Amino acid sequence: MGKILKSKSSWPRTVVRKWLNLRSGAYEFHSDYPVKGMEPRRKSCSDMIVPENFQGWLGQGNGDLKHSTGEQHVTRVDDKLDLKMFVGTWNVGGKSPHEGLDLKDWLKSPADADIYVLGFQEIVPLNAGNVLGAEDNGPAAKWLSLIREALNNTNNLSPNELEHTKSSQQPRFSFSGLSDDTPIPCNSTPPRGYSLAASKQMVGIFLCVWVRDDLRKRITNLKVSCVGRGIMGYLGNKGSVSISMSLHETSLCFVCTHLTSGEKEGDELRRNLDVTEIFKRTRFSRSSKDSRPETIMDHDKVIWLGDLNYRLRASSDLHEQLRNHDWESLLEKDQLKIEQRAGRIFKGWEEGKIYFAPTYKYRINSDNYVVQTEKSKEKRRTPAWCDRILWKGDGMKQLWYVRGESKFSDHRPVQSLFSVHIDLKNQSNRKTKPVNQNHRPNPVLTYTCHGKVQAEEILLLTRAQSCIDTLPRLISSAS
């Protein structure tokens, strides 16, 4: 009886420790790029999986990249550079990828991209163990491996590049086989292709940025920021992972989000509040004299991607329009577009024209949507465009906005291709852009939604108690 009481009283401390652990590791990220001036960091759950001397894990440093000696300075011949940027988002429904999963359908593009920005939601199941316990980065490692293989497929290389790749390849390492003192070799001259600039995970949200190798030395100021908007408004089952970086003299920010779910009336207000809080709480560390971007809106160009979870406003003709594939009429009921037109969120942001079918909710391994019937016990799910890509900033043009057809999860992936103008010369007269005023929270909205969210999340925690009781590692860590 004493053990049961102890277990039931331990979950608040477990939640607090989880929150503190997220905060202590908030500025760590994974990268192929070595960084100098790395600041010492407090140990977190990642240290139990990857040894401290693993050169891929980066603490938040001064953002300056270490280049190997002998690299020649590239002459700048123009003020601007035109690049292609591929952006993809995919809610994978808590499923870990199987070996050999083909990502070609998702990563295909009408033109080769210089930068790939890939965001995931639910890379792990959003159960009590993953939300409150140590982070499971096994699925993230698998996704990175598959992406690396797809982007650097030797079938797409020229004979010279192929020979260089063969001579430069290093043996693969398994995280599960690492001990605390296992040395991991770092190849100082990677083959031509794509390298991981940065990746960051927060529970089920995972964001990674890949850059063409010949642009690698022009990437600086890599930083990350996480905002939890899940349980109690701070845990990471919902929220955002953001990556900030500079390419030449242009600052870029990528925000991968998984917003509050639900299609009851008023749930869109909770999603609006998530967006407001993400703008408010996303911060990239910098010194007091540093002019580098600190907030999302300080950047020159911003991409916002993810499962935004906005649904279709209920109406009598909704299902008829779905049957007729009348996407134009259905999009008039899209909550994201309604809220944006009203100026409540994403004022001044752009999204491409949607010509594809709703991306959620599908039956697994099927082309059929989940539709509730009288005998069905499933939650009511009206198909919707939950998965979106938006952008803000001058010098960006969307060339392509489509969905993939992978049946891996209950969401269809979405992808886009952008043409991006990059400044090659320092714009010394450029001033920091203020955060848009429309993202300040409405006091009444904040108070109403906060009370509703708190009540529902306390109920969720209570129901999750039976799950927590079965997790010895959580109980022992909290005792």
Swiss-Prot record:
Region (Catalytic 2) residue spans: 379-394
A molecular-function term among this protein's GO annotations: inositol-polyphosphate 5-phosphatase activity
Protein name: Type I inositol polyphosphate 5-phosphatase 8
Keywords annotated in UniProt: Hydrolase
Swiss-Prot/TrEMBL GO biological process terms: phosphatidylinositol dephosphorylation
Keyword Transit peptide: no
Region (Catalytic 1): 300-315
UniProt EC number: 3.1.3.-
SMART domains reported for this sequence: IPPc (SM00128)
Gene3D superfamilies in UniProt: Endonuclease/exonuclease/phosphatase
InterPro entries associated with the record: Endo/exonu/phosph_ase_sf, IP5P_plant, IPPc
Family: Belongs to the inositol polyphosphate 5-phosphatase family.
